[in-house]
Amino acid sequence: MYIDLNADLGESFGNYKIGNDEAIIPLITSANIACGMHAGDFNVLNQTIELCKAHGTGIGAHPGYPDLQGFGRRNLDMTYDEVENLITYQLGAIDAFCIKHGMKMNHVKPHGALYNATSGNEGLAEAIVNAIYNFNPELKVMGISGGTLVKATEAKGMTAINEVFADRNYTDAGTLVSRKQSNAMIHHQQAAVEHVLRMVRDNQVKTETGKLIDLRADSICVHGDGPEALAFVKAIIETLNNEGIKVQTI
């Protein structure tokens, strides 16, 4: 049995440093790299792909809303056509640096509010998938396990990656608890490890109300901007290895 381990990275820009990419990238198997709209810039994009190449880490695009001030975590009122163009623009940016370094993208994962907004919104999910398909139909699409984006990807005949979150709590509907709520994040390492093990080994998640619901886990996400990220990644890998579960790029 194996599982992919991903993190959202490349989120520094200019003089502002976010996350600990240099320490995390050698440990994970897939990196979701900001493309300059919600975070990141041309230098950071270049450096992050260099790091991925050096450590054999799978490269993924992490396109978000054009909202540096809100870190892409605020909803923007955009038409489906605008979203499709937004995704295409960001895919072009990261692909240019992949070409520069002789690398290829493996997957695409929308960021933040854009990712969450696909839940129950088939039109938005289809706009994102169409942009990716028209850019490169071989790219995999990462979305919340069993969600609208995953279904839209599969309907297009593309490969979907069912993602679960090590550091986020879930609602009874299988969506992520809003960051506006105090219990959105999991801050304790042991709780995160138990959370991951239940999802990967048992294909279940315990929701915020204590209910167990079924889900599929293809890839585990740890948010790279969190202060606990590096410790979480190390603990998760150790626990999975002890369970005989191999961590590798999907």
Curated annotation (Swiss-Prot):
InterPro entries hit by this protein: Glyco_hydro/deAcase_b/a-brl, LamB/YcsF/PxpA-like
* Any GO BP annotation: carbohydrate metabolic process
Q: Which reaction does it catalyse?
A: 5-oxo-L-proline + ATP + 2 H2O = L-glutamate + ADP + phosphate + H(+)
Q: Name one GO molecular function term.
A: ATP binding
Name the Enzyme Commission number(s) assigned to this protein: 3.5.2.9
UniProt KW Thylakoid keyword: no
* Superkingdom of source: Bacteria
Q: Which Pfam families match?
A: LamB_YcsF (PF03746)
Listed A to Z, the keywords are: ATP-binding, Hydrolase, Nucleotide-binding
Family assignment from sequence similarity: Belongs to the LamB/PxpA family.
Q: How does it assemble?
A: Forms a complex composed of PxpA, PxpB and PxpC.
Listed PANTHER family: 5-OXOPROLINASE SUBUNIT A (PTHR30292:SF0), UNCHARACTERIZED PROTEIN YBGL-RELATED (PTHR30292)
Say what the protein does: Catalyzes the cleavage of 5-oxoproline to form L-glutamate coupled to the hydrolysis of ATP to ADP and inorganic phosphate.
Q: What name does this protein carry?
A: 5-oxoprolinase subunit A
The record lists the organism as: Macrococcus caseolyticus (strain JCSC5402)
